[in-house]
A protein has these predicted regions:
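Short glycine/proline-enriched turns and hinge-like loops at secondary-structure junctions
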Residues: 16-17, 74-75, 110-112, 200-203
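Conserved phosphate-donor
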Residues: 44-61, 178-216, 244-267
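Generic N-terminal amphipathic, Lys/Arg-enriched alpha-helix
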Residues: 16-24
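Glycine/serine-rich anion-binding loops at beta->alpha junctions
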Residues: 15, 62-85, 214-229
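N-terminal, positively charged, Ser/Thr/Ala/Gly-biased leader segments
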Residues: 1-17, 143
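Acidic/His- and Gly-rich active-site-bordering loop/insert found
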Residues: 21, 28-35, 40-60, 64-67, ...
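Short, surface-exposed beta-edge/turn micro-motifs
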Residues: 19-20, 158-160, 188-189
C-alpha cells in the first residue's frame, strides 16, 4: 500500500545539519512488526508512524521506533512528527497548541516563530548513580573517575544516565568505547559540559548509546536527553533558563535546541523542523 512519507530535519536552523527523522504519515493498518522492520531499514535513529488519536484530547497519535525497539517518548521525533502532521494537512484544535498522544501519554507542543517546543515529560527514574556505575561509566567514556563532576539518572523513557564533565571541551574530547561496558543490556549516556559565559551556547551535549548489536552510536541531536538534562541542571541550580544548547558538533552537525521554563516550573525543549524529503513509501 502506498503511504505518504516525509524525512524531516530537526533541531537545526539549516537543512541537513540537525537530526533526520523518517515519518510515515499514514501509519494506520501497519503491524508492530512492519513498523519495526521499516524502522530498521531506514537506518535512522528514529522512525515514526502517525495514527488517529484514541482520546479526544489529542490531535494525533504517534508510535516511535528506534532500530531495535519502540519508545514511549522521544524528543526529536515529537517535534518532527508534529511538523510532518501539520505539513500533511493536520489541523489542531488550538492554533497555538498541538497535543500529541504517544506511549508516554499526552504531550503538549507549542508552535512559534522559531519552531516547535514540547513540554518535558516527568522523569521516570532520577537520583544519583552509585559508585560502581560511575566507575563503569568512566571506563566506557575513556576518562578518569575524577573527571566526572556528577552523574545522575535522568530517564524520561529511553533510559538516560546523565554525566556532567568540567566543561564543553571535555565533552567534545570523549572517545567512548562500549566494549568496556560490563553491565549487560543497553546503555544510554548523556554527556554535558558548560561553555564559558558569553558563548553562543550555554552547554555542549552528546548522546552516546549502544545499539541492538552492542555497537556504539552517537545521536546528532536529542530532544529527550536535552529535556531531562534541563530538568536536572535547572533543579540543581547549575543552569538558568532560557538557554541554548549545542549538540552534534563531533558529527559535523549544528544542533541548537533551546530550553525555556514557565513560571510554574514546566520545562520546554524547542527547535526548528524542516522537511527535506517527501513522497510515498510502499508499506
Amino acid at each position: 500500500m502506498r503511504r505518504r512519507f516525509q524525512q524531516v530535519d530537526v533541531f537545526s536552523p539549516e537543512p541537513f545539519l540537525g537530526n533526520p527523522l523518517a515519518v510515515v504519515v499514514d501509519g494506520e493498518g501497519l503491524s508492530t512488526e512492519q513498523m519495526q522492520q521499516f524502522s530498521r531499514w531506514t537506518n535512522l535513529s528514529e522512525t515514526t508512524f502517525l495514527l488517529p488519536p484514541t482520546t479526544p484530547e489529542a490531535d494525533y497519535r504517534v508510535r516511535i521506533f528506534t532500530l531495535a525497539r519502540e519508545l514511549p517518548f522521544a524528543g526529536h521525533p515529537t517535534l518532527g512528527s508534529c511538523h510532518a502532521w501539520l505539513a500533511a494537512g493536520g489541523v489542531p484544535r488550538d492554533a497555538g497548541r498541538i497535543v500529541q498522544e504517544c506511549g508516554a501519554g499526552l504531550v503538549p507542543i507549542r508552535r512559534g516563530e522559531r519552531g516547535f517546543a514540547f513540554a518535558a515529560p516527568p522523569l521516570i527514574r532520577t537520583g544519583p548513580v552509585d559508585g560502581v556505575m560511575v566507575d563503569q561509566l568512566a571506563s566506557v567514556l575513556g576518562i578518569g573517575r575524577g573527571e566526572i563532576v556528577d552523574a545522575q539518572w535522568a530517564d524520561n523513557g529511553p533510559g538516560w544516565v546523565a554525566v556532567l564533565l568540567k566543561d564543553a571541551d571535555a565533552v567534545l574530547a570523549v572517545e567512548p568505547d562500549f566494549s568496556r561496558w560490563s553491565g549487560g543490556g543497553s546503555l544510554d549516556i548523556g554527556l554535558v559540559g558548560a561553555y564559558p559565559p558569553g558563548a553562543e551556547c550555554a552547554w555542549e551535549v552528546r548522546a552516546v548509546f549502544s545499539d541492538d548489536q552492542g555497537a556504539m552510536r552517537e545521536d546528532p541531536v536529542t530532544g529527550s536527553l536535552n529535556a531531562s538534562l534541563a530538568q536536572w541542571l535547572l533543579a540543581s541550580g547549575r543552569a538558568t533558563a532560557p538557554y541554548l544548547a549545542s549538540q552534534g558538533t563531533r558529527l559535523g552537525r549544528r544542533g541548537r535546541p533551546w530550553i525555556e521554563q514557565d513560571a510554574d516550573g514546566t520545562v520546554w525543549v524547542g527547535g526548528p523542523a524542516i522537511t527535506c524529503i517527501q513522497g510515498d513509501v510502499e508499506l
